[in-house]
Amino acid sequence: MAGTVLLAYYFECTDTFQVHIQGFFCQDGDLMKPYPGTEEESFITPLVLYCVLAATPTAIIFIGEISMYFIKSTRESLIAQEKTILTGECCYLNPLLRRIIRFTGVFAFGLFATDIFVNAGQVVTGHLTPYFLTVCKPNYTSADCQAHHQFINNGNICTGDLEVIEKARRSFPSKHAALSIYSALYATMYITSTIKTKSSRLAKPVLCLGTLCTAFLTGLNRVSEYRNHCSDVIAGFILGTAVALFLGMCVVHNFKGTQGSPSKPKPEDPRGVPLMAFPRIESPLETLSAQNHSASMTEVT
């Protein structure tokens, strides 16, 4: 976990990994959209996004686990499913705390892992945003841009702000789409797997679909503001979905308890088992041999 957090920090806050310089056409209409401004000027700012992504599944897990623990029937099943981990002579980790730590810990790990995958994809591909040419401000009077079908590999042709150009080279996959769908799907899998409601059958579907719809609208907002291409958002959705499904199904096993495997019965010690006496069965060869021996003794006599 510490290594994952450290790697995410290097991707986000340092220049350790340089973005690939991808070429472009000076007259590419897909890269000439208006500049939407910084990320802080977006309708969904990074601060709001990260707070909602981290707080929503964590709050759902806390509320769900505490509610189930205080229901008698559910508490008994949880205690039967979970093992109690001894942490000392006088302290132990009860099933409620253990489930909360496990589910929130796996969620946090997946959040950092998704961020790493997204940053790695953006660094390796260097895919250009829809507003790249607007902030790049290439020198259209140069010989390279005079030809309409000339592919430009020289990154020095840009005359705009270098920091903005650097961010404009990070489009594939969409980080907002990947993180939002991961968080929404993880929370949805938890709700459908653990929370049981008999009073209202529409409560869980409405809550789950509302959560997924929020993630979907986050991706659409990136496209509508010309911050990402449609392909970037789709790739982000696929990446976040894959991470959430893997962790939910293969790591926490659909949020079920970790029952210990039934221990195999120990074989009985043969030294403590009394021996059983079986009747002796006389062999026909022994009988015939005894008769021949008796006859020979009679002849000698």
Where would I find each of the regions flagged by the language model?
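Membrane-embedded catalytic cores of phosphoryl/pyrophosphoryl-handling enzymes
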Residues: 98-102, 113, 137-299
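Alpha-helical transmembrane segments of multi-pass membrane transport proteins
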Residues: 109-110
